[in-house]
Every structure is written in C-alpha cells, then in structure tokens.
Amino acid sequence: MKLRPLHDRVVIRRSEEETKTAGGIVLPGSAAEKPNRGEIVAVGTGRVLDNGEVRALAVKVGDKVVFGPYSGSNTVKVDGEDLLVMSENEILAVVEG
C-alpha cells in the first residue's frame, strides 16, 4: 500500500532508535525515547492559501528532518511499518550534509 498525504501533510519514517547508551548500557524498548528524526517518504501537494493558490512544500521526499517530541501523533501502519503523518509546520528543521 502507498500513502499519498493531502495538502501540507507529509509521511515520515522514523529513524532507528538508539538502544544503547554512550556507556554501553542496553535500554529496553519501554525506556528508550522515540527518536525525533526521520526521513520523508511522501509529501502532499501543498498548503492552500486564503486566495486559493497552492504553495508548494519546502521539504521533499528523501529529506532527513527533525521534529518535536509531540509532533506526528498520527501513526499509520503500512506493510507492517509504522509511519508518521504530520503537517509540514510540525517539522523543525531539515538535516543537511
């Protein structure tokens, strides 16, 4: 199945969790925080402005992004994988380099 987000929404695949601390302690899944980074796998057509124009999104498929800890509360399971659906304005930054 393939998701096509609407308007200014994006679909993000979370980065893999770091399950080991810098000191080598392995964290159980319940103790590890969910990562706030991911890769964009799909983007919507853009934000519809008040005058009816559609403004394209500033992010694109493949971008690595950082988002807030409470962003992306909409989780969708696609082909056994949990993906996040959020508005572009919930993305804090694009990771470059």
Swiss-Prot record:
A GO CC annotation recorded here is: cytoplasm
One Pfam family of this protein, by short name? Answer: Cpn10
> What keywords would UniProt list here?
Chaperone, Cytoplasm
Q: Molecular function (GO) terms listed?
A: ATP binding; metal ion binding; protein folding chaperone; protein-folding chaperone binding; unfolded protein binding
* Database matches in SUPFAM superfamilies: GroES-like
**Chief localization:** cytoplasm
Can you say where in the cell this protein is located?
Cytoplasm
Q: Name one GO biological process term.
A: chaperone cofactor-dependent protein refolding
Which InterPro entries does the UniProt entry name for this protein? Chaperonin_GroES, Chaperonin_GroES_sf, Chaprnonin_Cpn10_CS, GroES-like_sf
Entries under PANTHER family matching the protein: 10 KDA HEAT SHOCK PROTEIN (PTHR10772), CO-CHAPERONIN GROES (PTHR10772:SF58)
Q: Summarize the protein's role.
A: Together with the chaperonin GroEL, plays an essential role in assisting protein folding. The GroEL-GroES system forms a nano-cage that allows encapsulation of the non-native substrate proteins and provides a physical environment optimized to promote and accelerate protein folding. GroES binds to the apical surface of the GroEL ring, thereby capping the opening of the GroEL channel.
Describe its partners and assembly state.
Heptamer of 7 subunits arranged in a ring. Interacts with the chaperonin GroEL.
- Give the family, as the similarity comment puts it: Belongs to the GroES chaperonin family.
**Designated name of the protein:** Co-chaperonin GroES
Organism whose genome encodes this protein: Pseudomonas syringae pv. tomato (strain ATCC BAA-871 / DC3000)
Q: Which gene encodes it?
A: groES
